[in-house]
Amino acid sequence: MKRTWPIALALACCLNACTGLGLLALNTVSTFQSYSRQSNIAYGPAAANRLDVYLPAHGAPSALVVFFYGGGWNSGDKANYRFVGAALAAAGIATVIHNYALYPKARFPQFMRDAAAAVAFARAHAHEWGADPARLFLMGHSAGAHIAVLLALDQEYLHQVGGDARWLRGVVGLSGPYDFLPFTDAYLNDVFAPSSEFYRSQPINYVHANAPPMLLMHGLGDKRVSPNNTRSLAARLEAAGDDVSTRYFPGASHGDLAAAFSPLRKQPPVLPLVLEFVAAKSALPRGD
């Protein structure tokens, strides 16, 4: 397939990686040679309940990552993050990226319920995809990191689909909001309404001992989501005795940590750190 490298490179360098054009540029250069993709698989009854799965070219059982994209809980599409699925699958990790209900058509906690349903579906079908359901990880960027971490910490949502956090070998959070009250964007008051329930939206409020291992990464140049979110969550996890690692990247912006999965943008070194984390935690037993 012919690639327009100069145009894509210019777009990726000049645009924020989380804009539509920036994501298009990053997807333009994703390679199709080292993975396969199955698209628009239904994981639930709603129109938004569709997922794509990216599979390694080799036949050995792989770890399985469910990736949650960001977009402020009101935008985003799985197709825009093909470059993430491609990077992980090319490295030998089966990857699921799903669409979920978005504001204003839906409000919290509907996108959490969709997330839990997608995880349960992925786990149930892992063997069909050549993946190991016992090596299941969650990963998200921005609002997606919020969803991934809250899903791992607040047991309510996985319980609703017959599971719990023991399903998970680990969680990766990239540029995530975990401790963000009071809201700085007015529309979030409606996304997470009523105000009496705002506390339920905060992952930091659900930290407990024996949480799944976490790798939390943040750019110190992030002007959208303060790195203090990662600092405060990591401190709370450490105080609870949980396994948590952090990496902070000087100068990296909010979108840089997602863009780093593209062949165009290999810095900061997010992908190798994710691969190292998945390999290390896959080797450890997770109690049932």
Question: What is each of the regions a protein language model found here?
Answer:
Residues S30, A46, G176-Y206, P212:
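Mobile cap/lid helix-loop segments that gate and shape the active-site cleft of serine hydrolases
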Residues G76-N80, V84, V96-P133, P263-K266:
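Catalytic nucleophile-loop/oxyanion-hole region of alpha/beta-hydrolase
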Residues L216-H218, D222:
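Short beta-strand/loop motif that positions the catalytic acidic residue
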Residues A117-A186, F198-Y199:
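Primarily recognizes the serine-hydrolase "nucleophile elbow" in alpha/beta-hydrolase
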Residues R231, E238-D288:
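C-terminal catalytic histidine-bearing segment of alpha/beta-hydrolase fold enzymes
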Residues K223-N229:
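Conserved alpha/beta-hydrolase "acid-adjacent" motif
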